[in-house]
């Protein structure tokens, strides 16, 4: 009896709260559009507009659009319209202020579904039955409760696993350029990613049941979206993938919310459903250009190359939503893809991204032109969290030494190659010729591998040792004597 009473009481309180909220914040509708500027709509005579409030716009033809308040000045409000402003008539457009921020419905049922850039299903399936409605800006994670990423993810790609190991919970972008196979590399990582399986040690890896991919596309062409969708379907992982697609012909402004919707879904899957989520964001250059468009429409003071001065802060609000949290088994690993305009790594987008993220994977056009796949240049690539994710107990005790030595030999080989172009091969010393041989074999045997070739980290390390045996022991100065004694002999099997 007490139970029904409390339920009735709760119901009564709920009705009172709703009516009280409605009295204090009625959902007012305005017809006071004073101007349209690019993606922005300016409204006058608005009663108490709130920053970041969601506005529903009803056009003269009956279609609905949504927007967000960007700026408030007295009774004036500047609204950013996500679906674009084409067709908005200043006299006949109704604007309703909802009094709420932008929230997105989240549920475990989002896996296996395809959404547009605004989070609406576009796969002819039913609407999402929401378990919760979450703010798309996400909850800030207390730095004290973050866990340092220490479990290495094996991608099956030698250039990444040995030289630039990725840890679970890391954010590491792929720096690429137009026409390079960054999509193929990202798809291969999605197909092959898993924890390192150490021989003789049973690793309980719930990779199959507990792994999810959230893929957000911003301003990509139809071909790229089809490529990823088809790849996920072919390898049978589509039921563990959630896709958000903002294509090149979709509104530019929608690109600003697409990565945030994707990351909100990823946070729910990671921290509520305790899944290990891999988030692929492509293309961050399109996102930054959308940011520049809004900034220009608001007539803000531009920074480098016309991008807004707050672009660093804005990118950080996306990239920092990766990691692991104490008391939760899930994790978010981020691999944003960005295409460098004119192959320029000093461009503001890759430049600022490199400051925020924990390293980068650099896709090189010269390697690609020589038919090398994956064309990952290991010299400018970096993984800042590699040191804590490798070594004895995690991969193998020779891992960091082999990585350092391969890096050093490849760098010297590049210098020798440049010198050979000037002085000719006859003027080179025997040591120089060894470095040249190493350079060729490193690119041919170590970096080059098939699209579906999944090498374990141990196979990759063994290939590294085969290459290092080109040199006499005395020239391998980066490897301690104890490691050399164990691994350098040709008959050593590990």
Curated annotation (Swiss-Prot):
Keywords: ATP-binding, Hydrogen ion transport, Ion transport, Nucleotide-binding, Transport
Database matches in InterPro entries: ATP-synt_VA_C, ATPase_a/bsu_AS, ATPase_F1/V1/A1_a/bsu_N, ATPase_F1/V1/A1_a/bsu_nucl-bd, ATPase_V1-cplx_bsu, P-loop_NTPase, V-ATPase_su_B/beta
Superkingdom of origin organism: Eukaryota
Keyword Acetylation recorded: no
GO BP of this protein: ATP metabolic process; vacuolar acidification
Record PROSITE patterns: ATPASE_ALPHA_BETA (PS00152)
UniProt-annotated binding residues for ATP: 384
Matches recorded under Pfam families: ATP-synt_ab, ATP-synt_ab_N, ATP-synt_VA_C
Sample GO molecular function, one term: proton-transporting ATPase activity, rotational mechanism
GO cellular component: proton-transporting V-type ATPase, V1 domain
Function of the molecule: Non-catalytic subunit of the V1 complex of vacuolar(H+)-ATPase (V-ATPase), a multisubunit enzyme composed of a peripheral complex (V1) that hydrolyzes ATP and a membrane integral complex (V0) that translocates protons. V-ATPase is responsible for acidifying and maintaining the pH of intracellular compartments and in some cell types, is targeted to the plasma membrane, where it is responsible for acidifying the extracellular environment. Essential for the proper assembly and activity of V-ATPase.
Family the UniProt entry places it in: Belongs to the ATPase alpha/beta chains family.
HAMAP family assigned: ATP_synth_B_arch
NCBIfam families reported for this sequence: PRK04196.1, V-ATPase_V1_B
Subunit and partners: V-ATPase is a heteromultimeric enzyme made up of two complexes: the ATP-hydrolytic V1 complex and the proton translocation V0 complex. The V1 complex consists of three catalytic AB heterodimers that form a heterohexamer, three peripheral stalks each consisting of EG heterodimers, one central rotor including subunits D and F, and the regulatory subunits C and H. The proton translocation complex V0 consists of the proton transport subunit a, a ring of proteolipid subunits c9c'', rotary subunit d, subunits e and f, and the accessory subunits VhaAC45 and ATP6AP2.
The protein's name in its UniProt record: V-type proton ATPase subunit B
Lineage, uppermost ranks: Eukaryota, Metazoa, Ecdysozoa, Arthropoda, Hexapoda
Gene symbol of the encoding locus: VHA55
